[in-house]
């Protein structure tokens, strides 16, 4: 989590070293909440067979810039802000659990919510890999 006295722009500038790239990360971070909703929409379209696998992957790659670091960083900060840091540390490797914790965090922070249908699909899609 970013030190509360340091802004995101300063944080990214310090760790990245390139002003342009730091600005891109700040931009990605600032639109992360909307990107999470878009990601949910894409995966539900795939789950409902409205789009094929290749289209799904192409659309997800538009969101997961730089391996999704800004998105994951945003989600982690929301989880920590909601007091769920320890749970996140235990479960961060499991995509379903990470998104479940994000949902709990958004409930606590009164932000936009993920749908149960999305979480059910994510659980089903990942349970064979994460037990």
What are the residue ranges of the model-derived segments?
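Zinc-dependent metallopeptidase catalytic helix centered on the HExxH motif
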Residues: 1-30
């Amino acid at each position: 989590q970013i030190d509360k006295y340091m802004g995101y722009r300063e944080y990214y500038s310090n760790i990245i070293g390139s002003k342009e790239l730091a600005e891109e990360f700040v931009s990605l971070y600032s639109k992360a909440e909307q990107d999470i909703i878009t990601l949910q929409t894409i995966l539900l379209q795939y789950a409902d067979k409205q789009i094929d696998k290749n289209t799904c992957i192409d659309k997800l790659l538009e969101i997961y810039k730089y391996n999704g670091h800004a998105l994951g960083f945003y989600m982690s900060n929301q989880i920590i802000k909601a007091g769920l840091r320890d749970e996140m540390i235990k479960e961060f490797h499991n995509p379903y659990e990470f998104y479940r914790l994000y949902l709990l965090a958004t409930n606590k922070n009164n932000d936009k919510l993920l749908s149960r249908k999305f979480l059910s699909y994510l659980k089903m899609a990942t349970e064979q890999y994460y037990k």
